[in-house]
Regions:
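Alpha-helical adaptor scaffolds
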Residues: 2-44, 48-56
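Boundary/linker segments of alpha-helical solenoid repeat arrays
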Residues: 8-9, 42-44, 71-85
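Alpha-helical linker/edge segments of TPR/alpha-solenoid repeat scaffolds
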Residues: 21-24, 59, 87-93
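Short cationic/low-complexity microdomains
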Residues: 57-63
Length: 93
């Protein structure tokens, strides 16, 4: 990001990495929010944001963004997105 602070693929990857290790989730949310603002129909970015929201304890937002990720995937929904949606749906009853 230092070399190209506008590279949203790198932003998404960093946000995802921070989320996976559970470190600095607020920074992960901030980076991920930028990606969905720039590409609001990108299912990968929506999935990342939804999962971060889940990790932050915001089930309502998590479901909203994960549902959008599925909707924007068309017929080829990635298994990871489906898995995230099912996990959040199960945990956030």
């Amino acid at each position: 990001l230092r070399m190209d602070p506008r590279n949203i693929l790198v932003m998404n990857n960093l946000a995802w990495s921070l989320c996976l290790i559970g470190k600095d989730l607020m920074r992960a949310e901030e980076l991920s929010r930028i990606t969905i603002m720039r590409e609001p129909s990108n299912p990968i970015y929506l999935d990342t944001y939804g999962w971060i929201m889940y990790k932050l304890g915001d089930c309502q937002s998590a479901l909203f963004y994960l549902e959008r990720a599925i909707e924007n995937s068309g017929e080829n929904v990635e298994k990871e997105i489906e898995s995230h949606y099912k996990e959040v749906k199960k945990q956030c009853k």
